[in-house]
Amino acid sequence: MRRLCIILLVYVYATFATKGICKQDEDVRYMGIDVVVKVTKKTSGSDTVCQALRTTFEAAHKGDGANDSLSTEYVDDYSEEEEYEYDESFLEGFVIGSTYYTIVGGGLSVTFGFTGCPTVKSVSEYAKGRIVFIRLSSDAPWRDTNPMSINRTEALALLEKCETSIDIKCSNETVSETTYGLASLAPHITQATERGNIIGSTLVDTDCVENLDVTVHLGEMCRKTSDLSKRDSLKVKNGELLDDDTFSIHTPKLKACN
């Protein structure tokens, strides 16, 4: 009974928090992104996930001169390299340049690139046998400690600019996993009725990858219906790109890599 009460209290708190932050001015938009990848490898391999996670930020801006200026900072930890460059776009708070996340685990090294997209806060992975799942997503605004809101005009620009890239390579990494429990729930993003162009460059190492499924959902996180949403998908089977429209990928319980 005590456990049931705790669960109910958590649910009630989450409900009120959701309604509280989402019930704001009509032109306040909370945009998020959710990327799910399922890789079927050619052979079974390591089931160790989250062996390494590296994040690189790149966002050029116009300086005083004719050329773009660049500011770079390297952290002390050799396993993590961060590059900071600053952009003067009106979409303050979002990374307008490119952000790259490299996840090593399950016998793969996968780099995701996000250009002009909402910030990814959660990275998680699952591996068993030949199957590897990876998910990258924004935090729901009621769970985010510093949720970023924009207006409709800015949201439309975000939908136009956001592009993702994927580079999947084989990996023989032997480092033990670093996980932080089960991954948190992905944000609920308003379902888009039509497919858009979000997925850009995709590189796949066919020496170890047999099949690949990718879905990307981009849009509002506070509204049941909205025209401010896009989705895209990609499917590779036996090394061939297929024109299938996959709406969603069901994932098992993933482990948090950050």
UniProtKB/Swiss-Prot annotation:
Keyword Signal attached: yes
Region forming the signal peptide: 1-17
Domain of life of the native organism: Viruses
Glycosylation sites: 67, 151, 172
Protein keywords: Glycoprotein, Signal
Family (UniProt): Belongs to the poxviruses A41 family.
Protein name: Protein T1
